[in-house]
Regions:
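Polybasic, low-complexity RNA-engagement segments
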Residues: 2-182
């Protein structure tokens, strides 16, 4: 964990390891407000639930890490990733990760696509299905019954899976007797 007062090129608290510019950086206001504002505007997730969380950024990915003083002892470690990836910049747009929607999905109040199990199986198999849904174009939370599956991209008439490739790869997926096509 990088202390908020440090930046790339500065010494660590024990002065034996130099910070590397590729390590995650703390996200501070106003960028933090922009990132959390996106989640609130697009999905209705209140910013207040992130009060006890740090945001870190490395490349195009934003990571979430719980604030915990016990982690300060790890400050001297070389860090490649930390916490849970919650957002990614895709070009000029923010995309929530499926992990973020699974973790905070209970707070999502808008842009939710609820699929029947057979539709979900088709989306997993084909990566895209046709249909109109009562959401605005853009990233959406996909669920079936009460299970949050992850992120999708809704374009008028099309729902495109944004699930991580490994999420259903090399698995026989079965949900209430509906098998995934291999």
């Amino acid at each position: 964990m990088i202390p908020p007062s440090k930046s790339a090129g500065e010494s660590t608290p024990i002065d034996s390891i130099r910070w590397d510019s590729s390590w995650p950086k703390w996200v501070k206001s106003p960028e933090r407000n922009q990132l959390l504002g996106f989640l609130q505007e697009r999905f209705g997730i209140p910013q207040s639930i992130f009060t006890n969380q740090h945001l870190l950024k490395r490349g195009a990915t934003v990571w979430l890490l719980t604030r915990d003083e016990r982690l300060s002892g790890l400050a001297s470690l070389s860090v490649e990733t930390v916490g849970v990836p919650i957002l990614r910049w895709v070009g000029e747009r923010l995309k929530p990760t499926s992990a973020a929607l699974q973790l905070f999905g209970k707070y999502v109040t808008k842009n939710i696509v609820s699929l029947e199990p057979i539709q979900l199986a088709e989306l997993i198999g084909k990566r895209e299905i046709r249909g109109e849904y009562p959401v605005s174009p853009g990233y959406v939370q996909i669920m079936t019954e009460s299970i949050i599956i992850g992120c999708g991209l809704y374009l008028p008439g099309r729902l495109i899976s944004q699930f991580p490739r490994h999420m259903f790869a090399n698995q026989t997926w079965e949900y209430q007797g509906i098998s995934r096509l291999e």
